[in-house]
Amino acid sequence: MLVCGVRVLTLVVVFTSITNAADGDGARHKTDPKFLCSQCPKEGVDVAQLHRNADRLYREFKAKEAAEELLKILSWDAENFEALVKLSRAHIDLGDMIPESVPGWQEKRMNEYRSAEDYARKAVAVNPGSTWGHFYVAASLGNIAVISPVARQIELAGAIRDAIEKSISLDARNGFAYHAYGVWHRKMAEIGKMSRIVASVVYGRSLPAGSMEQSVEYLKKAITLNPTVIVSRLELARTYIAMEDWPAARSLLSSIRELPVQFSDDATHKQKAGELLEEINHR
């Protein structure tokens, strides 16, 4: 099955620096007087406080409640860039939290991911020069691809790549975008020649090329920029396993033991790293 890989980032990384990154890269409340007032017009809306509320709720893994605070901001200012990107992030999380045991889970997840894409594209329209709008376009499309038919996955592969590349071009220090691109390259490289021929014949569309070497390069860059993010080390180890570079994979998986648990899925990924290390320990 063709999976484009961006989903990995949005599933397991609660973006620690998204607030600061958005603040420094397009959040107008730092420079626009109407965002600096303590008693804003229109029923006393305090946008800065609403952002703080949303950030606190998100840190507590309450994505739904955080989204409600962000919607209050958009009801007053529909072009608030920071609220738009945070809403995209929140809807990705809401989709991820829907278990497969729920009737109609795929449709429910798809609705959340489409909402995430919608907010991300609105963010790009408001501030096309920010890395985060493009990044969340890629992230939302990656999640959509995971639960879509193969034809749709093939269609989205190039769009995901383009959004990631744009995100990186706008901020060469966006480690999350490098992470996503590293996983994307591995997923594309893992698709065999026959599968590519079938995709071309059956779906009338060629698949983008991927490279294990570039997967290593981009995931190493992600780790350099975010050295304590567990999932980047785990994904680089998976690339090394795919390349049968067992010593490099073992070294990375072992290093995860000492990393602090920072995000909601870190414990799960530490466990997976331990399982993988056990599997390849004698390779």
Residue ranges with predicted function:
Residues 21-71, 75, 81-86, 90-99:
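N-terminal leader/linker segments that initiate helical-solenoid repeat arrays
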Residues 5-17:
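Bacterial N-terminal signal peptides
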Residues 75, 125, 224, 257-258:
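Amphipathic alpha-helical segments of tetratricopeptide repeats
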Residues 230-268:
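C-terminal/domain-terminus segments
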Residues 52, 86, 93, 136, ...:
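"A position-specific structural signal for the A-helix of alpha-solenoid helical repeats
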Residues 22-41, 194-201, 251, 258-283:
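Terminal, low-structured helical/coil segments at or just beyond the last alpha-helical repeat
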Residues 36-39, 57-65, 89-129, 137-173, ...:
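Short coil/linker segments at helix-helix boundaries
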